[in-house]
Structure formats: structure tokens, C-alpha cells
């Protein structure tokens, strides 16, 4: 890639600071007009297909809801909305940063990108916390793993993300450059310092904190799963090995999609005001543009993750009749304070052990069959 960098007031044709306003260097970004249309097109097709299938299973085949399935449903809704908006960006970048649509539509497309990004992060965090409770505190997970609690948490996530991303609708704008109309993904020059401050707050609140929570949850889960059970010898059981692989896969995908994007975007915004060489700034700009498709790819990877982690959903898609979920035993209900039947100590220990093993598939209860956004 030829650098071909010149000062901001250069008169040759090209793009300045990629597709942003107020930058001092001109970048040759021919790679972007191939990379972004192709990658967004693939994400659009795969994301829509996978998430539509997931929504069909959730709405038409799944009869019993728990916390994990509730969070996955909302995750699929968010991914579907974002994938449906990608054809506009495919057209935009294929035309060489020309936006023939309205400014309102430009704002909406950028808003959907960030809304999907942070909804995915927060819903993955909710799923991680729920799984962590299921491994570390099975009986507490039995009580708090019901869909009615998860629906309330999901509603809070939507309200929080929509409120936090509402300023994007104010900052994002369009501008005319010769015969082209550019749809910026930041702000106008006079508002850029405010946009950087806003983005820094979002970085900490909606990425750094959830990522730390997910990391802690999966470290605790891995320690518990890798610890041999009392009185056993040899390697890990097959179920535990699969759980450990799932943990590693979730962390890897999370880091692949979200971490590079946030790191390069932070550098991209921070270095714009510094007196660095255009070659250095060009490298940072290129890295940021390359990680944007990675952030979008979570719309395709989310369904794969929860299909792999939740084999019950695969069985629901394959079988004509979903399997009947087990109900909490009287002993487990007694420990949760629901009622206190008299049982022998031996039977109590036996059933409690069974409950701990099946915590992951705890039913949400009869009142959780209706799902509301």
C-alpha cells in the first residue's frame, strides 16, 4: 500500500483522514473500498440467515425459557437489526464514500452499529454471569436463573444502551466534498473534542467494565471446572472438557471482535490531535479500518457461539417435539425456601447432587413462556 501522504491542504484527489473531517493528512485508502463492501456483505448475508434461524427456534420451537435463552433471544434481535442495515454501508463504500441517502439515514446506520456492538457486549456479559452462578452457586442460579428476572435485566440493557448511544444521533453528520456526500462515523470538526470525550466514557462504561466482568467470570469457572472432583483420579470428564473449550472459545471470539476495534479506535481518536508523522497516522488509520469488519463479525459469531454452548437449541431445531424440562426437586425447593417437606438425609444428599449437575438446564417455570422485549 503506497503511503502517498500529503498535508491537509493538498489539492489532489483522495480522502482525508479516511472519511472524517478536520485531519491534517491525506490517506490513500483504496483497500477500504474493497475490504469494507466485501466484509459487510458477507456479514449481512450470514448474519441475517443465522439470526433469523435463531429467532425462529426461539419463537416457534422453544417452549421453556430460562435466563440464558432470554439473553440469547435479545442478542439475536440486536444482531438481526444491525445485519439488516448493512446493505446501505455496502453500497456506500462500494461507491467510494458516496452517500446518496438522507442525513437521518446516515445517523441511523451509525447508531445501529454502536447499539449492536454494545448490546452484544452486555448480553454476553449477562450470559457469562448467569453461567458463572450456575457453576459456582448452583442453588442461587436456580432462583435467579428464571426468565422473568432475565427479561427485566434485558430491558435494563436495552434502555441503558439506547440512552448511551443517543448522542451518536447528534454527533454523526454528512458533508459534501465535490460531487460526493460523505457519511461520517464521528462528528463535524467543531464537535470532535466532545465526541472523543463521549467515546472515552463509552469505552470505559460499555466495554472495559463488561470485559473485566466476563474475564473474571470465566477465570473462576475455569478454575472450578479444571479442579478434579473429590475422590476422582485421572483426566477431566468429557463434559468438563467441553465446558472448558466453550469458555476458551467465548473469550477468543470476544477478544477478536471487540478488543482490537476498541484499542485501534482509541489510538485513532487520541493521535489525531498529536503532531505525529503522516506515515504513523496512516498506519493507525489503516489498523482502525481493518478492525471495523471484525467488530461487525460478532453478528455472525454470536449465533455460532450460543448454538455450540447450548446443545438443547440444536435438539429443538432437529426434533419435532422439544424435550420436556425437568422441574426442581422438593429438596432443592426447600433449600431455596419455597417449602419444607420432610425427607431423609440420604435422599436429600442424592437429589441435591442431581440438582447441581443439571443446573445449566434449570427451567424458567410456567410463568416464563411469554417473552417480551
UniProtKB/Swiss-Prot annotation:
Pfam families on file: 7tm_1 (PF00001)
GO biological process: blood vessel diameter maintenance; establishment of localization in cell; mucus secretion; phospholipase C-activating G protein-coupled receptor signaling pathway; positive regulation of mucus secretion
Residues exposed to the Cytoplasmic side: 60-70, 130-152, 221-246, 310-373
CDD domains listed in its UniProt record: 7tmA_P2Y2
Main location: membrane
GO molecular function (one): G protein-coupled purinergic nucleotide receptor activity
Purpose: Receptor for ATP and UTP coupled to G-proteins that activate a phosphatidylinositol-calcium second messenger system. The affinity range is UTP = ATP > ATP-gamma-S >> 2-methylthio-ATP = ADP.
Entry protein name: P2Y purinoceptor 2
Origin species: Mus musculus
Name of encoding gene: P2ry2
Amino acid at each position: 500500500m503506497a503511503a502517498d501522504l500529503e498535508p491537509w491542504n493538498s489539492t489532489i484527489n483522495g480522502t482525508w483522514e479516511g472519511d472524517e473531517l478536520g485531519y491534517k493528512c491525506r490517506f490513500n485508502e483504496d483497500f477500504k473500498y474493497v475490504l469494507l463492501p466485501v466484509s459487510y456483505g458477507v456479514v449481512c448475508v450470514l448474519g441475517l440467515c443465522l439470526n433469523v434461524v435463531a429467532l425462529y427456534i426461539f419463537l416457534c420451537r422453544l417452549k421453556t425459557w430460562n435466563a440464558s435463552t432470554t439473553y440469547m433471544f435479545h442478542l439475536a434481535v440486536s444482531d438481526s437489526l444491525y445485519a439488516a442495515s448493512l446493505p446501505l454501508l455496502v453500497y456506500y463504500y462500494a461507491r467510494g464514500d458516496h452517500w446518496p441517502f438522507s442525513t437521518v439515514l446516515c445517523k441511523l446506520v451509525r447508531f445501529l452499529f454502536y447499539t449492536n456492538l454494545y448490546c452484544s457486549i452486555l448480553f454476553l456479559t449477562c450470559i457469562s454471569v448467569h453461567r458463572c452462578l450456575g457453576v459456582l452457586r448452583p442453588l442461587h442460579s436456580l432462583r435467579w436463573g428464571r426468565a422473568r428476572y432475565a427479561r427485566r435485566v434485558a430491558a435494563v440493557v436495552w434502555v441503558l444502551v439506547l440512552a448511551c448511544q443517543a448522542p451518536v444521533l447528534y454527533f454523526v453528520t454528512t458533508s459534501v466534498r465535490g460531487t460526493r456526500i460523505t457519511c461520517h462515523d464521528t462528528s463535524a470538526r467543531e464537535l470532535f473534542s466532545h465526541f472523543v470525550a463521549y467515546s472515552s466514557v463509552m469505552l470505559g462504561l460499555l466495554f472495559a467494565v463488561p470485559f473485566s466482568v466476563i474475564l473474571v467470570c470465566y477465570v473462576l469457572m475455569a478454575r472450578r471446572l479444571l479442579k478434579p472432583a473429590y475422590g476422582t483420579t485421572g483426566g477431566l470428564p468429557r463434559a468438563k472438557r467441553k465446558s472448558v473449550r466453550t469458555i476458551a472459545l467465548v473469550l477468543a471470539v470476544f477478544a477478536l471482535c471487540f478488543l482490537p476495534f476498541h484499542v485501534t479506535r482509541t489510538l485513532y481518536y487520541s493521535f489525531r490531535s498529536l503532531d505525529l508523522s503522516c506515515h504513523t497516522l496512516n498506519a493507525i488509520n489503516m489498523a482502525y479500518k481493518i478492525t471495523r469488519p471484525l467488530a461487525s463479525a460478532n453478528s455472525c459469531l454470536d449465533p455460532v457461539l450460543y448454538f455450540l454452548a447450548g446443545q438443547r437449541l440444536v435438539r429443538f431445531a432437529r426434533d419435532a417435539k422439544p424435550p420436556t424440562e425437568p422441574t426442581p426437586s422438593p429438596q432443592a425447593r426447600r433449600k431455596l425456601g419455597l417449602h419444607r417437606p420432610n425427607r431423609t438425609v440420604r435422599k436429600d444428599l442424592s437429589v441435591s447432587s442431581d440438582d447441581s449437575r443439571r443446573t445449566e438446564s434449570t427451567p424458567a417455570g410456567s410463568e416464563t413462556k411469554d417473552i417480551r422485549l
